């Protein structure tokens, strides 16, 4: 949807003092949603009892399998965030 909007309206200028592209800001915002910290024993308890993956997995899993993320951040092929073999749902 964002890319379609950009095509129709043009690319917005970057925010002053922010040295990230709009694509990078998109992924940064996604990651920040899942940002948090907890004590190791609480994390282990949550992993054992919750049906949902912990925040870091919700970020690293999808983004490391995203070609768009790898392009936005210029991740080297074969790196942790741009593995050569990716899992694709669609």
Regions found by a protein language model. Give the residues of each.
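Zinc-dependent metallohydrolase catalytic domains
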Residues: 1-90
């Amino acid at each position: 949807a964002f890319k379609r909007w950009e095509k129709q309206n043009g690319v917005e200028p970057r925010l002053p003092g922010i040295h990230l592209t709009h694509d990078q800001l998109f992924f940064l915002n996604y990651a920040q949603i899942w940002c948090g910290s907890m004590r190791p024993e609480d994390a282990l308890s949550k992993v054992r009892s919750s049906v949902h993956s912990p925040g870091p997995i919700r970020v690293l899993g999808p983004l490391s399998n995203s070609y768009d993320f790898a392009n936005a951040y210029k991740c080297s092929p074969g790196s942790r965030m741009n593995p050569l073999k990716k899992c694709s749902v669609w």
